[in-house]
């Protein structure tokens, strides 16, 4: 059946209704595009609002071909009178289009009545059906803005999109047209009438290309499907073989598609699959199959495979700078944990300031003064400056206490009404924490990590007070001092929880064991001398906050027993001692180390599965704690929150993950986890420091605040542009104009007059009506800045602005400002012509862009 897509200049629904009722008005039917097929009938169709199975048009009435004589109207490009359509209507075929809809809506049975009467008495139903199902454009503007403004683009896109029932969008079909032919014909002006419009569509030379273009477009579509199927396969192969977190997985997919479909590659692919006149129509789009997916391997996948494989990651990306020397002369804390001697001092901020001022005064002429306050105290603690008096060394820190021979820790302690700072080099840690009694009743045999953790009963307290000695063992925080070497890596690990997460004891301990396995393997690559079976990693978990707990504690044997009832996050503190004799200098290496550990936690398949099931893993290790003066809560200590009624809560309780080598002596491991010097950044060790790590770099993301995925994203989107002035000079030289300009201003004006303006003017003459184009016959340019110029028209020796380029306003005055903007895009310039009009209809002086022209790409 011959199919005609038509339009009207009046409300199409009412025009169609009048034809169905055989009472046609004087309105006209305009055949826009026709698909011929030998038949006794002609089907008149409109585009539907929804397209099921890519069927984008549907019939609204059917005519007898012989009565209508459609070929006469097509050959003469004439509209069809509604009366002629009504007289040639095929009642039987047309009735079948509407009768079921009418009967289903009214609930009546079929009556023996002519269709025209049935239609007449159901006008509202038919009008509602037509307006609800079809698009009803009444001017050429809609077709031009939808399908394209040039003859070839309009017709080829419309024919393929409407008639071929292919799964291609309008945008995709337009891309196919550009690949099929470089010449898409003349511009069709948007202000043409419907009669002028069908004169173009029914007489166009592009009608001869419908069959070839449809064949090419189907082949291009198949090639695109095959290409993207292969690309998807390549992306999924890596995604399934690696163990990315959910967040990283999303980032990876975006980066992969953007890498494969980067502008240059996509343009090359389009050129490769463009229509080749030297090949038969059936052999188009067959060259270099899978080019996009194959390019992804070289540009991204081989890099990702190295970065997301633990062995390759450490070999290729991790660079560690070490200094080995038996005479390094650097030292960590000197801190005794079993001592009856009281050297701990507790001072407020004001008292510290006075103490530092006194220290500066006593050392005047001997030591350089330090800044009063906490920073000064930290500097004194780390300072090894001394004076020799009668063969005896007097250190600066001994002005604070005579027994402070080596660096001492500084703690922040929360009291009821204030913070206080404590420092010293000895305390009776085990006795005051009650650890001696705990160790006394511990079982000797190892049963399981879970049983061992449950067996520890710490002495507890609930209330905040102003007693320094009590609070020293409940709310203590260590203050980081980057001047002192780090002997333990202390990690603050927060795992944000999913809303539906259920954390059983088995899940939690499995997660901790896998975290230990992942981190100890990473530790082995950084410190090859360690024994992974015996090297400890100490875990602490913030106690669950049950103040807002709405759980039902009624016994239910079928209910899953939760080990953790936290709702927002799981807070873990992880301490990994460095090997004896090794230390890290400063906070920067620790930040990089935290990023590395963040990354390696995503590389283990089992760990990733658990983390993805209950948490939102990603950048979980906090890197903000490694700055001088920042503090972190020590294991076994409580949180304080004045809003919770001065109560202590959220204690860091020990989770014992015993390594294989300590299963036969688990009490020794527990003693190690109770040793405060294993829980402090700068804890005291037995062996002197002979190896110092002063720099750790992840070459994949050397910047502290960027992950590997973030860096890849920035590299994709942050295109490096050449300076506009440089591009202007290059264009002048390329086009054979000697740039003798003495300044950048002269170069810019020369470029616009000689190169830029002729191109813009040609665009205006070709695509704009005469009223607009004539305004630009004589112009001059005024430089605004290095990238913007204003255009003024010159007439009879006078300079003036322009009348509106968008509309003909009442009283159309010359008060519109017109500009040219230059924008660098890689190795080329884009020229943008824009204006501002004061009229309300033109958005009251807002920027209106009229054309944007990309100049040719310059060679490097």
Curated annotation (Swiss-Prot):
The record marks 492, 494 as: Essential for primase activity. This is DNA primase. Its EC number is 2.7.7.-. Belongs to the herpesviridae DNA primase family. The gene is U43. It comes from the Viruses. One of its GO terms (molecular function) is DNA-directed RNA polymerase activity. HAMAP family: HSV_PRIM. Keywords: DNA replication, Host nucleus, Metal-binding, Transferase, Zinc, Zinc-finger. It comes from Human herpesvirus 6A (strain Uganda-1102).
């Amino acid at each position: 059946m011959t199919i005609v897509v038509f339009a009207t200049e009046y409300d199409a629904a009412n025009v169609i209704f009048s034809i169905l009722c055989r009472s046609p008005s004087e309105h006209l039917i305009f055949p826009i595009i026709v698909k011929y097929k030998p038949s006794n009938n002609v089907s008149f169709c409109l585009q539907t609002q929804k397209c099921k199975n890519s069927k984008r048009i549907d019939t609204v009435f059917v005519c007898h071909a012989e009565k209508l004589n459609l070929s006469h109207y097509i050959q003469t490009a004439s509209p069809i009178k509604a009366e002629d359509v009504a007289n040639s209507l095929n009642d039987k075929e047309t009735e079948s289009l509407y009768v079921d809809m009418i009967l289903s809506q009214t609930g009546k049975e079929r009556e023996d009545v002519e269709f025209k009467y049935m239609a007449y008495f159901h006008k509202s139903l038919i009008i509602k059906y037509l307006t609800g199902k079809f698009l009803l454009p009444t001017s050429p503007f809609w077709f031009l803005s939808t399908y394209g403004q040039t003859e070839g683009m309009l017709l080829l896109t419309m024919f393929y999109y409407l008639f071929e029932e292919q799964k291609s969008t309008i945008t995709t079909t337009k891309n196919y047209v550009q690949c099929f032919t470089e010449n898409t014909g003349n511009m069709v002006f948007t202000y043409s009438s419907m009669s002028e419009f069908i004169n173009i569509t029914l007489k166009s030379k592009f009608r001869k290309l419908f069959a070839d273009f449809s064949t090419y477009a189907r082949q291009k579509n198949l090639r695109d499907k095959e290409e993207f199927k292969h690309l998807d396969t390549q992306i999924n192969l890596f995604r399934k073989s690696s163990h990315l977190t959910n967040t990283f997985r999303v980032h990876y997919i975006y980066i992969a598609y953007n890498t494969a479909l980067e502008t240059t590659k996509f343009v090359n692919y389009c050129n490769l699959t463009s229509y080749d006149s030297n090949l038969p129509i059936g052999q188009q789009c067959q060259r270099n199959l899978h080019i996009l997916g194959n390019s992804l391997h070289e540009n991204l996948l081989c890099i990702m495979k190295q970065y997301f494989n633990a062995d390759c990651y450490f070999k290729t990306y991790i660079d560690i700078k070490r200094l080995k020397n038996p005479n390094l002369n650097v030292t960590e804390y000197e801190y005794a944990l079993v001592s009856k001697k009281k050297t701990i001092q507790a001072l407020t901020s004001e008292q510290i300031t006075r103490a530092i001022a006194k220290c500066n005064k006593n050392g005047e002429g001997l030591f350089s003064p330090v800044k009063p306050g906490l920073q000064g105290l930290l500097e004194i603690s780390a300072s090894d400056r001394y004076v020799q008096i009668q063969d005896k060394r007097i250190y600066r820190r001994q002005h604070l206490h005579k027994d402070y021979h080596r660096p001492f820790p500084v703690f922040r302690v929360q009291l009821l009404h204030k913070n206080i700072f404590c420092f010293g080099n000895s305390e009776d840690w085990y006795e005051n924490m009650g650890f001696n009694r705990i160790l006394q009743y511990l079982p000797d045999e190892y049963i399981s990590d879970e049983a061992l953790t449950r067996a520890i009963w710490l002495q507890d307290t609930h209330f905040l007070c102003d007693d320094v000695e009590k609070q020293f063992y409940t709310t203590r925080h260590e203050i980081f001092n980057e001047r002192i070497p780090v002997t333990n890596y202390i990690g603050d690990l927060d795992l944000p929880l999913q809303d539906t997460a259920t954390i059983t004891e088995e899940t939690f301990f499995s997660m901790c064991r896998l975290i230990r396995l992942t981190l100890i393997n990473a530790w082995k690559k950084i410190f090859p001398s360690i024994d992974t079976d015996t090297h400890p990693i100490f875990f602490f978990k913030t106690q669950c906050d049950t103040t807002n707990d709405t759980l039902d504690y009624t016994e239910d044997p079928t209910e899953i027993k939760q080990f953790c009832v936290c709702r927002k996050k799981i807070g873990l503190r992880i301490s990994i001692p460095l090997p004896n004799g090794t230390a890290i200098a400063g906070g920067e290496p620790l930040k990089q180390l935290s990023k590395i550990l963040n990354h390696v936690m995503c590389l283990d398949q089992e760990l990733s599965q658990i983390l993805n099931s209950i948490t939102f893993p990603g950048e979980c290790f906090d890197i903000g704690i490694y700055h001088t003066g920042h503090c972190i809560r020590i294991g076994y200590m409580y949180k304080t929150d004045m809003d919770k009624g001065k109560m202590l809560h959220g204690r860091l309780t020990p989770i014992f993950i015993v390594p294989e080598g300590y299963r036969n002596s688990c009490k020794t491991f527990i003693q190690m986890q109770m040793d405060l010097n294993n829980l402090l950044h700068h804890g005291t060790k037995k062996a002197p420091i002979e190896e110092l790590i002063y720099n750790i770099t992840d070459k994949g993301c050397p910047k502290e605040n960027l992950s590997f995925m973030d860096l890849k994203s920035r590299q994709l989107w942050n295109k490096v542009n050449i300076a506009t002035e440089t591009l202007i000079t290059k264009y002048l030289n390329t086009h054979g104009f000697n740039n003798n300009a003495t300044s950048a201003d002269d170069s810019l004006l020369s470029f616009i007059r000689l190169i830029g303006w002729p191109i813009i003017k040609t665009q205006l003459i070709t695509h704009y009506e005469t009223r607009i184009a004539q305004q630009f016959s004589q112009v001059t340019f005024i430089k605004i800045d290095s990238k913007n110029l204003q255009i003024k028209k010159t007439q009879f020796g006078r300079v003036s602005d322009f009348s509106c380029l968008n509309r003909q306003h009442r009283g159309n005055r010359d008060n519109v400002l017109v500009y040219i903007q230059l924008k660098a895009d890689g190795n080329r310039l884009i020229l943008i012509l824009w204006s501002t009009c004061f009229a309300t209809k033109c958005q009251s002086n807002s920027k209106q862009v009229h054309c944007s022209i990309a100049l040719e790409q310059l060679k490097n």
